[in-house]
Amino acid sequence: MAEISKENEDNFIFKMKVLYNQMIHIPSMFSTLKTEFPLFFETDTTNIIHLPMTLQSKIIQKPTRGYCSKFIKMLTQTLERLDKEVNESILEKFLEIISPITPHQNDDGGDNNQSEDKTEYCWKSYYIQNKWITLKNENAYNLVGMTTWGAAYQLSDFILSNQNLFINKNILELGSGTGLVGIILDFIKPLKKVILTDYSPKVLKNLKFNMELNNLEIQDFINDDDDDNNNNVNKENDDKINQVRVLDWEIEDLNILNNYSGLNDSNIILGADIVYEPSLCKYLVSILYFLLERNENSVAYISSTIRNQSTFSIFQKELNLKNLTVIDITKQFEQSSPTSPFIYDRSQIVLYKIYLEKK
């Protein structure tokens, strides 16, 4: 009869937790686990009998009711195939999950009496440098900035494997979305300033929520008028490293950016999955040029998933029109990067280093 060590069991649980919290396709999850931990799926082992209680306490939580339901279905089917009894607590959890959701409760388990928010959310978590981080995402893909996209994972991988590039730098992120990149930057010490920006009020609210969910202190500029100098001066005296603020790309007079305190000091400009709308490419590149021109030796790192080649070609054309130097560092980065804490499809994602040549 196969014996499984405590260490092996812990590794199995940890791997399952990583896959589960990133919402990996359930059959793919079990296939991966079976390949890496075959002893847990052999009919002659007794070790899987006591796993349900461990799974109940360590695994079966969010990210969503639907995903949890599919997970428990697959788990019970696997146990039944192995002719093992399904733990009663697992079945109780399953019945709880599939029961009708109350009118005042959304997918995050919260009470909606006050907010009346009927949006369904999912919660994805990642284990990075001995620490779990969690992001609240929208379940439906209705608003770009409410989802954590693959390019954000690539850019986060780049940051984690090139931390020396970011130490003691002022960093600006365009289109910060759910805030993954901002949270990853918190792993780097020291930093001077991190400015996270987006445009949609809903996205900014969620961005702020995710930062605070992961215990990051922020300066909140979301509801400030940019010409309110007294208010901004007071906030600039705040010693918090992270700022969250509104930034609309569609501005004709870029000099208005001078009113955004700290933007012109950016040494590094970051962006992930921000090349998706053809009409915005001109404005995005104009902002990149404006900021790169004002700070000598500044550089931008833009990670993009190429879903539509024509849209990406417009972006490339606008970069050429501004005489910006563009280097595709995707392969160079992939060859040197360590194992990623994220599970995602890299096949259509590119990473550009963009800067302005000195005259």
UniProtKB/Swiss-Prot annotation:
Q: Which residues cross the membrane?
A: none
Cited Gene3D superfamilies: Vaccinia Virus protein VP39 (3.40.50.150)
Return any one Pfam family short name: Methyltransf_16
Domain of life, per lineage: Eukaryota
Q: Which GO terms describe its molecular function?
A: protein methyltransferase activity
Which CDD domains does the record cross-reference, listed alphabetically?
A: AdoMet_MTases
What SUPFAM superfamilies does the entry give?
A: S-adenosyl-L-methionine-dependent methyltransferases (SSF53335)
- What name does UniProt use for this protein? Putative uncharacterized protein DDB_G0277003
What broad taxonomic lineage does this protein's source fall under? Eukaryota, Amoebozoa, Evosea, Eumycetozoa, Dictyostelia
